[in-house]
Every structure is written in C-alpha cells, then in structure tokens.
Regions:
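Residue-level signal for inorganic ion chemistry
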Residues: 23, 49, 60, 93, ...
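Small-residue (primarily alanine) positions within well-ordered alpha-helices
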Residues: 12, 16-19, 118, 219, ...
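Short loop segments at secondary-structure junctions
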Residues: 110-114, 124, 133-135, 141-142, ...
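An extended, acidic
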Residues: 148-263
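Short gly/ser/thr-rich secondary-structure transition/capping motifs
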Residues: 66-73, 142-143, 227-229
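DPxDG-like acidic metal-binding loop motif
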Residues: 79-137, 156-158
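N-terminal subdomain of lithium-sensitive/metallo-dependent phosphomonoesterases centered on the IMPase/IPPase/PAP
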Residues: 1-90, 258
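Generic detector of well-ordered alpha-helical packing
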Residues: 50, 54, 73, 89-92, ...
Length: 263
C-alpha cells in the first residue's frame, strides 16, 4: 500500500477547512444547545459536531469514495481500499460549549496498523498541526513551523497534561497521580490541544484513559511524525483507544511507563 503524500494531504486539509467552516458559526453562540449522549454522566453533542462531521464526509465522498470512514457522530462506513478515515469533528465538546478554545477537529488516515496521517485543527485560534510520512508542521497566525517534540530526560523536569482530574477509574487515577507526583508541573482540562502542544515541544507527557479510537488516532499521527511516542499503559499500540501515554521522547516515555505498569 502506498501513501500519496500530495493528494492525501490535500484531502485532509480540505476536510479540516470544511469542518472549520461548519463549526465556527456555532462557537460561543448564546443559543447553542447540547444534547447528552449518556444516561449517567454528561457527554454532550451539538449541531456543530454533526455539521462538521457531515462536511468532512462530503469531502471524502467526492475524493475518496472507496475509503472507509469512522466518525464519532455517524459511526462506521465500510470501504474497499483497506484505508479508513477516523474523524472526531469536535474533540472536547465540553470545552466547546464552555467557550474555551482547547477543543479541536481530529482527522486520521489509517490502516489496520494505525494512523499514517494525522491532523489536530483548532479553528478558532487558527492553528493546524499536521503529521505524515512527509514530516510534521503547524500553520497558524504566525506562519508555518516544523513540529518537533522536546528532549526532556527526567520526570522531575517534565510537564504533564490530562483532561479530567479523575482520569478514569480509581486505579487509573492512582496510576496518573503516581506519575504526577514525580513531574515538575501538571495541568488539566486541555482536551486534544494537549497533544498538539506535545508535538510542538511545549509539553512532555499526556496521560489519559477511556479514549475511543477517534479521540487518539489524529494526535498519534501528529505526535509520531514530530518525534514523539504514543502507546497504551503497557507499551503496546494505542490506536484503538483505551489508556494512552503520549511522550515527547523515548526516555521520558520509559520513565512514565515504568510507573504506570506498576499500578
């Protein structure tokens, strides 16, 4: 199977552009409503989520009709090519309905072995983080820059992010907190933007649990192209979701993984 860098990247950018156009009219709108997808807890979905995924699916229908699609809002559509586009139209809908610009559009092009292309796009700020076999770059208000993870060697110097303070189950929270006790700084509530910052060399670790494939495949594509590592908490592949450890480099990954494995 070959990767056509030019055309696949063009399609991915067109999808991200379409999602931006669909989402931004809804952001910080006073009359925006959210439905709860859970009977217990709160997992919101809005008209913006659905409009963005539909816009991306329309792009794929024009340019990649033989590829499969897996989107958070409209599920899976089988393809014939052996490739699948994995979409989260708004990762961080809780942040979206709260008006914080930490949410993003996640796009991945994947095979059964995992992502070969990833995008994390923040429409309101105007930043786009892209990873592919051709490299990793970000574009934004200040131009274009190469993405490269940093080389922090010690947990004592590391910056750690997660989205929810509880992380997941009590055991998962305990594992996260065991790492957090060793790092220099821990921050919460960043949604997918934390992974983008890791790829950009601002963050050393992101540790989460309970993820779906569409929550992590886009970030994997970006982080790995920028030189980082993304695994589960046992060191295995993370592209199917679950417990995720994203790290800037092999040393900091090994240090965090050693703690998580022991919990």
């Amino acid at each position: 199977m070959t990767f056509d860098a030019l055309t696949d990247l063009q399609v991915a950018h067109e999808m991200a552009d379409a999602a931006r156009a669909a989402i931004l009219p809804f952001f910080r709108r006073a009359d925006l409503t959210a439905e709860n997808k859970l009977t217990e807890g709160f997992d919101p979905v809005t008209a913006a989520d659905r409009a963005a995924e539909q816009a991306m699916r329309e792009v794929l229908g024009r340019h990649r009709p033989d590829d499969g699609i897996w989107g958070e809002e409209f599920g899976q559509s089988a393809g014939q090519s052996g490739r699948q586009w994995v979409l989260d139209p708004i990762d961080g809908t809780r942040g979206f309905i709260s008006g914080t610009p930490t949410w993003g559009v996640l796009i991945a092009l994947s095979t059964e072995d995992g992502p070969i292309l990833g995008i994390v796009d923040q429409p309101y700020i105007g930043e786009r983080f892209v990873g592919s076999p051709e490299g990793a770059v970000m574009t934004g208000p200040h131009g274009v820059a190469e993405l490269k993870t940093r080389d922090t060697q010690s947990l004592a110097d590391a910056v750690l992010f997660t989205t929810f303070p509880e992380v997941g189950s009590p055991d998962e929270r305990a594992g996260f907190e065991a790492v957090a006790r060793q790092v220099r700084l821990t921050r919460y509530g960043m949604d997918c933007y934390a992974y983008a910052l890791l790829a950009a060399g601002q963050v050393d670790l992101v540790i989460e649990a309970g993820l779906n494939a569409y929550d992590i495949q886009g970030p994997i594509g970006v982080i790995e192209a920028a030189g980082g590592i993304v695994t589960d908490w046992q060191g295995g592949p993370a592209h199917n979701g679950g417990r995720v450890l994203a790290a800037a480099n092999a040393d900091i990954h090994a240090a965090a993984l050693n703690i998580l494995k022991s919990k």
